[in-house]
Curated annotation (Swiss-Prot):
Organism: Actinobacillus pleuropneumoniae serotype 5b (strain L20)
Family that this chain belongs to: Belongs to the ATPase C chain family.
Name assigned to this protein: ATP synthase subunit c
GO cellular component: plasma membrane; proton-transporting ATP synthase complex; proton-transporting two-sector ATPase complex, proton-transporting domain
Site (Reversibly protonated during proton transport): D60
Length: 84
């Protein structure tokens, strides 16, 4: 039983790490492309900024969903019932 709990904690940690890494890479690419496009066409900066914030919110949702799934696996582990 301890091995299932240990594997669950390791899996949840890996899930959170990859979600944070993906979100950070996504924000870096998004910010770089926004600055590049704003420098290329300054008259579109306001509409691009609105779209950038929408995509930034969706990128944040990835990390929040990963936290929710990790908490589900840690506190309500469905795999422990298989051992009984």
């Amino acid at each position: 039983m301890e091995s299932v709990i240990t594997a669950t904690i390791i899996g949840a940690s890996i899930l959170l790490a990859f979600a944070a890494l993906g979100t950070a890479i996504g924000f870096a690419i998004l910010g770089g492309k926004f600055l590049e496009s704003s420098a290329r066409q300054p008259e579109l900066a306001s509409s691009l900024q609105t779209k950038m914030f929408i995509v930034a919110g969706l990128l944040d949702a990835i990390a929040m969903i990963a936290v929710g799934i990790s908490l589900l696996f840690i506190f309500a582990n469905p795999f422990i019932d298989l051992l009984k």
